[in-house]
Amino acid sequence: MKRLYRIFMMLSLVGLVSCDLDLYPETSYNEGNVEVNASTEAQYDTREEMLGLRNKIYGDWTKGIQEYGYQDFLIYTECRADNAYCGTNTAEIMQIEANKQDGENVNVTRDWGYYLTQMSNANQIICYVDRILANDPAMTQEEADRWSAEARCWKAWALFQMSRLWGSVPVVNTIPPAITSENIASVYYEYFPPQQPLDVVYSQLVDDLTFAIEHAPDVTDDKFVFTKGFAKGLLARIYAEEAIRDWNKVAQLCASVENDYGYELCENYGDMWAYTEADAVRNTKESIFEVQWTNKSEGNWVYMMFHRNAYDNMANYSWAKWVTPSRDLIEAYKAEGDTERMNTSIIIDQCAWQNYYPGDEYAFNHKVPTNVSSIIVMRLGEIKLLHAEALACLGDLAGATKLVNEIRARAKINPIKQPASQDEMIDAILHERRLELAFEGHRFFDLVRHGFDRAKKIHDEMPQKDEYWQDRLPLTQETILMPVPQSALDDNPTLVQNPGY
């Protein structure tokens, strides 16, 4: 009945609907090969229009990454584990910390739409570039391949984030044709596609990133460009996931990122988030991909969600901040004597609230210290620890230990001895990733990657260890994933709610 109703509603639009991509829902995607449906009218005709779309990739990142891809993602990754309290009494983030989220959650709803929109925008390049190459002699094959590769990196990042949050999701691959009375039934599932199982999702990720590894730009000094290095690093992350796991491929990809593109660890951990009176640091030799702002009169706004702007000290500092560092994380740094990473990741300051600490000694996330500080999406330190993880899972504990100790040496703390067992090595790597990558969006999924029991133990024990955590519903296999937003279910009757919600 719902399908018939939808078809009726679509028929009512025939004659009114052009193939403007903004007219169909953000859940409206189809599986299959990336292509423009033969009956889809051309939206773009020239190289200049395609260049504008390519540039829009990066413009969109400076906007959407702040709220959806960083701020919200830290709630899912840091506050669902042991790194951070949610920070305020905002209902939607309190629900996620307490494992009480539902399909009406504001963050869950907006983030679902954000990731689908990014894939849709990427498809405007992927689906049209060959047509423009054939019709506009100003475009070269190299440009077409490069811009498609950059769009595929964008799309793969969004799809991977989405799959970790929701599991089976719609796979974005085609631009639906205009609706006519003749095709209304056949295009239904292009406008209202079902979720795809993880093997389909991951197959798409591998396809897109394999293309990007061949055709994306080479690495340059500009780290706000999708490159071969980023594509390999993202594919390494993907092959570490249970649904497609291949530790040999993870190790090979990480080794290539480490050795083939000129990346190096910064001498000091804090160099990546440093700033002077004139400007913030960007494009360090360790950075693989970062989102950049260069104009202090505009810049990012997301700094205000976590602390102050070092260039305008009292601006937006009258209300409690999100993602407050936990006592457990601070103690983990102190137990290692790890002042280098602690003092970069966490700053102690005075404030007018006392939600988790006394107001004269309050802890804040300090990974976005100014409104022109970059958000680092991928860097070499993470890839080295992912490489260590792969080696440990392949039984090379000596190789894994060596990589961990490279990271510890940069942090100016003592090396670890080679653990006696694989499980102990994994624990050591997860601990190191926690200290190295705090507030970069990894912790919860690091734990999940190595088994439900690890994630559940840490998730469930926090309220018993520290009264400042909210009481949490026990983590279950089902609540590792977020609920599908109710609004998405209402808009697309082919979607089904995730189990447990």
Identify the residue ranges that each predicted region occupies.
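Long, intrinsically disordered, low-complexity segments
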Residues: 18-21, 44, 85-87, 115-118, ...
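Membrane-proximal, proline-rich intrinsically disordered regions
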Residues: 19-75, 254, 472-501
